[in-house]
């Protein structure tokens, strides 16, 4: 047992003091007095930190009290039905309702909304710069300059991409590692379609990799889903949708992704 747990060891061997419950009750009762004394006596940074902590505690306590009060509150509409029609979002309030069920429905809607933005791979392994970039030596005779980097991972460049002059190009993206299409799987339909990549939305490794269009595991890409014939609620054809890469493209030689629906 660690040396600093001698009190716990003593309690296990001999039991607690006979007045343990009484002392605990008195300590809890004195807590409010101690908090008041600390709030009045602390000065400087210590006072600011203490005030911030108490502020957060009070907010949490008020939330708990409000949730407890709203738990079983019932509301009922007037007995006489109104002649004016009600909109859809007010129809569920015409009969006696329970506030608890209403609040749980709101929470479920929020959870569904949060699930829309959840991704298949929430965490990915970090990639070091040594693995991502290969140093390219330059210099006419000595080859002493080493400011250029060659990207060793697959990349995506748009159709309107033009290389900078070789003399000023810092990051080199090899032609053999450029991908234009991805094998996208629809999670609900269970079909895999090869779709053209529109852009790289976010690379989890670094914003610089997003700017360079590097395709690594966990990267969010935008793909052209017009071939799938998906439409919005208003009837418009969906053009681009996000997908997350699920494989190591440099090992497999292709880009596999799951559509975010």
UniProtKB/Swiss-Prot annotation:
One of its GO terms (cellular component) is ribonucleoprotein complex. Residues 28-90 are annotated as: Disordered. It comes from the Eukaryota. Residues 45-56 have a biased composition (Basic residues). CDD domains: NSA2 (cd11381). InterPro entries: NSA2_fam, Ribosomal_Se8/biogenesis_NSA2. Residues 74-86 have a biased composition (Polar residues). Keywords: Nucleus, Ribonucleoprotein, Ribosome biogenesis, rRNA processing. It is found in: Nucleus, Nucleolus. A motif (Nuclear localization signal) lies at residues 51-58. Involved in the biogenesis of the 60S ribosomal subunit. May play a part in the quality control of pre-60S particles. Belongs to the eukaryotic ribosomal protein eS8 family. Ribosome biogenesis protein NSA2 subfamily. Component of the pre-66S ribosomal particle. Interacts with NOP7 and RRP1. Interacts with RSA4 (via WD repeats). This is Ribosome biogenesis protein NSA2. It comes from Ajellomyces capsulatus (strain NAm1 / WU24). The lineage of its organism: Eukaryota, Fungi, Dikarya, Ascomycota, Pezizomycotina.
